[in-house]
Amino acid sequence: MKPNDNEVITGSTILSLYGLRDCKDIDLIYYKDPPTDSHNQYLETHYKLTLDDIVNNPRYHLYYNGFKYVTLDVIKNMKKLRNEPKDRIDVKLIESLK
């Protein structure tokens, strides 16, 4: 995988980036031509942000080692909205940082 400014890493990878827990896969949001299994399908229901906001507004992403990641706040809000049992655990992990 090479850095691409039109792709944003999301999901549990962000928790791994902060040392909160390991991730098992890499979820992506694509600015152009997203595959059907991308996280673009969850933008309206779980993220409540526009694609343009996530990809282009620095308030909602950060760079690490050349790769673009959604911020921890974006993941926290997404997990609160989705509210699965694993998400509630992850929200507690995120809140333990503050």
Question: Which positions does each model-derived feature cover?
Answer:
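Residue-level detector of alpha-helical segments with a strong bias toward transmembrane helices
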Residues: R21-D22, I29, K76, L81, ...
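Metal-dependent nucleotidyltransferase catalytic core
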Residues: I29-N56
